[in-house]
Amino acid sequence: MESEKIYMTANPYLCTECGKGYTCLASLTQHQKTHIGEKPYECKICGKSFTRNSNLVQHQRIHTGEKPYECNECGKAFSQSTNLIQHQRVHTGEKPYECNECEKTFSHRSSLRNHERIHTGEKPYPCNECGKAFSHISALTQHHRIHTGKKPYECTECGKTFSRSTHLIEHQGIHSEEKSYQCKQCRKVFCHSTSLIRHQRTHTGEKPYECNECGKAFSHTPAFIQHQRIHTGEKPYECNACGKAFNRSAHLTEHQRTHTGEKPYVCKECGKTFSRSTHLTEHLKIHSCVKPYQCNECQKLFCYRTSLIRHQRTHTGEKPYQCNECGKSFSLSSALTKHKRIHTRERPYQCTKCGDVFCHSTSLIRHQKTHFRKETLAE
């Protein structure tokens, strides 16, 4: 009670809304505007309003560019005194904000808040596209680029763009021709110390990134991140055409070719094109005329061991690929993939003429012939 009397005497002007006390009537009047929503101080440049004149004055510096608060150490200027105080900690090394969990200290309150999420596990920034949540807004911004494909960091030398500034910096070393980091094992040189460290793992066999789920270890973070999606089921790469999602960007790129019909891999021997490099590699063996794999049943020869294994199932009747939905079995994985579309109703093959969609590429080809016949008759 005694302490309450002291407070009442020191702050005689009380707010009837929240009970907060002030030393003078002017301060109370100013405070009450926060409750009634009154904002009498308006910026003549952009129309934004404020409850206090001091807030308006600070805001106007955005338009005028005025920076009246200057650092005595380095001369850097700021529009707000609070920003100068924060900046000065760079020179003084002062870190007044301490973590209660691990006692680590920080120069900014916002840095402490970000750090505390390591202990609490709080992830307040969810992705609107896939629901994945992040502890920092910067991490969410970077993640968004997976969905948008945005690459805001452009190389001024060659025009190549990147989703992260660190990737651009690493790339720019290619143009500088300065390769000061050399591997002692094989004498190979690198532009960046990080590139050398990654390379050295090929010699040492070091795999510092270990999966908590299965214990598998990796030498590089990208491979580790991709692997973790096996356990989490995360598929951040979604096809804009049909909505199908993938855990790797390379798999999405390959899939999109089913819609676009793009076949960038060309056989130099016969001109045949393919949507995947692996398909071209297999095809090239046709021209080499080497068929080292022979069937023991019928003596038929094959270019590839996988082709022989598939063929042998015609003799054994083996059907190792089973549908989880209905239990039907197939001798080929491609046949199972086609069959599954009966259950999923997926129709990945779209006609560019009329927009009709089909389960199988053969159905699309048959359909497209109807357009060709109509065009021929029209001529």
UniProtKB/Swiss-Prot annotation:
It is found in: Nucleus. One of its GO terms (molecular function) is zinc ion binding. A zinc finger (C2H2-type) spans 13-35, 41-63, 69-91, 97-119, 125-147, 153-175, 181-203, 209-231, 237-259, 265-287, 293-315, 321-343, 349-371. Coiled coil: none annotated. The keyword Transport does not apply. One of its GO terms (biological process) is regulation of transcription by RNA polymerase II. Keywords: DNA-binding, Metal-binding, Nucleus, Repeat, Transcription, Transcription regulation, Zinc, Zinc-finger. GO terms for cellular component: nucleus. Its main location: nucleus. SMART domains: ZnF_C2H2. Belongs to the krueppel C2H2-type zinc-finger protein family. May be involved in transcriptional regulation. This is Zinc finger protein 883. It comes from Homo sapiens. The lineage of its organism: Eukaryota, Metazoa, Chordata, Craniata, Vertebrata. The gene is ZNF883.
